[in-house]
Amino acid sequence: MSDNQSWNSSGSEEDPETESGPPVERCGVLSKWTNYIHGWQDRWVVLKNNTLSYYKSEDETEYGCRGSICLSKAVITPHDFDECRFDISVNDSVWYLRAQDPDHRQQWIDAIEQHKTESGYGSESSLRRHGSMVSLVSGASGYSATSTSSFKKGHSLREKLAEMETFRDILCRQVDTLQKYFDVCADAVSKDELQRDKVVEDDEDDFPTTRSDGDFLHNTNGNKEKLFPHVTPKGINGIDFKGEAITFKATTAGILATLSHCIELMVKREESWQKRHDKEMEKRRRLEEAYKNAMAELKKKPRFGGPDYEEGPNSLINEEEFFDAVEAALDRQDKIEEQSQSEKVRLHWPTPLPSGDAFSSVGTHRFVQKVEEMVQNHMTYSLQDVGGDANWQLVVEEGEMKVYRREVEENGIVLDPLKATHAVKGVTGHEVCNYFWSVDVRNDWETTIENFHVVETLADNAIIIYQTHKRVWPASQRDVLYLSAIRKIPALTENDPETWIVCNFSVDHDSAPLNNRCVRAKINVAMICQTLVSPPEGNQEISRDNILCKITYVANVNPGGWAPASVLRAVAKREYPKFLKRFTSYVQEKTAGKPILF
């Protein structure tokens, strides 16, 4: 059949494929996500022979690559929000990469796609070659082995279709024969009528004959048979009209019977396919249900590693999981700190404590005016009682310690001012502020610092410090650059106590610029201490049982980056009271049995 022939020959002719040159090799520096501790690190990346490899640096390529992936089946995904980032995934392995700028990223993506295309998996020419082979095999076999084995009645259907094709040819021949017969008959009748009309016209001029009764008749009957002989059309003497009609009826009956059989076979095939379709739909329903269950279980598991789960407004981790991760990390740090404190013996340097007069002077450094302004603001506003203020919320109360918070947000970033009051027996304000300000003992009581150093010493009572805090995943690591000043504020009257204050506030310095590793936080913190002395009995000397230190601690912190508000407030509520208790206990421990420092 013509249709079958055209189907068999489809796909046998193709345009010759154009050969393209080999893909261009590429190498350069990209930032690669290493892990949640070290974050993004610059790596030397080489694209060659359908393989992407990376080295620690260009100088260390001779030592071998640190990792490589084949790009044949890799999936390259540009990030939705970060214009410089793109991800490459092969099965369960995912590389997170960042370029210098969007144009640089697009160049890398194009080069990787070219290597992937030339590998054969992503090539259109490869797909065309495979498709042509399938078409040729299908054309040679007529029907695929799968379809013929799936339905054995398919042979009967094809046979019936062939029979219908034969019936069609027979019917066409019969119709042509009958049509020819009718055309010849019509031509013969037309010629006969034309001849009769001509003879009648010629006889109109003949004289009539007289009959015995006096009537006149035309004398034309004598030649009637000669004039109008019986005409038989030429070319139809060999046609059996009756036989052709019977055959025509039989052919149409055969076509109807074959059509009926084909319809019956197609109905049976449809029923079989419907059963298969129902089974496949049931399988699909089960698979979708299993997929939903697997995704639900996956969401319950903790997520680690990828930068998509870091802190930020586009983080894939929700607030509850974010808080759980932060809390778990803080608990681990506390356990490590407790273990290290119990195992090691602290080394203490005999730091001479200057007299109070050394900290009473204002100084002459370039930040003198700023320090004086900060000190006066804290002395004016920080010592005010906020217990009855509706804007301040009492979030923690443990014995003498009370912690207040005022909720403030700016551009989605939590900037809650915090204020805590406490009363500690056996220590003076000078001692508390000295231990809080001194960098020699900072690591003894501060457990959140990873490292710190003094950037510049401005005066005996003022220094600039740069410190990096330990990272708490999934939050980004923070660093702080601040000026720390300690001051003694003399009492205005004899009944007023002396006040010691340590003021820490953020500044800028050329020796500690911003870096990509940490988020720079801004702080304004003050530790304000006043010493109250109860007179001893009799003529006894003042002991530590007679002194009480009233502490006011205020903190205004800008975290420098986005994090869930509920998480920040929950962590602050947990960590600030813990810090005050740990620090005051440390001061009590270090001053016990030593002379009182007023």
Swiss-Prot record:
It is found in: Cytoplasm; Golgi apparatus; Endoplasmic reticulum. A motif (FFAT) lies at residues 321-327. One of its GO terms (molecular function) is ceramide transfer activity. The START domain recognizes ceramides and diacylglycerol lipids, interacts with membranes, and mediates the intermembrane transfer of ceramides and diacylglycerol lipids. The PH domain targets the Golgi apparatus. Phosphorylation on Ser-132 decreases the affinity toward phosphatidylinositol 4-phosphate at Golgi membranes and reduces ceramide transfer activity. Inactivated by hyperphosphorylation of serine residues by CSNK1G2/CK1 that triggers dissociation from the Golgi complex, thus down-regulating ER-to-Golgi transport of ceramide and sphingomyelin synthesis. Shelters ceramides and diacylglycerol lipids inside its START domain and mediates the intracellular trafficking of ceramides and diacylglycerol lipids in a non-vesicular manner. The keyword Cytoplasm applies. The gene is CERT1. It catalyses: N-hexadecanoylsphing-4-enine(in) = N-hexadecanoylsphing-4-enine(out). This is Ceramide transfer protein. One of its GO terms (cellular component) is cytosol.
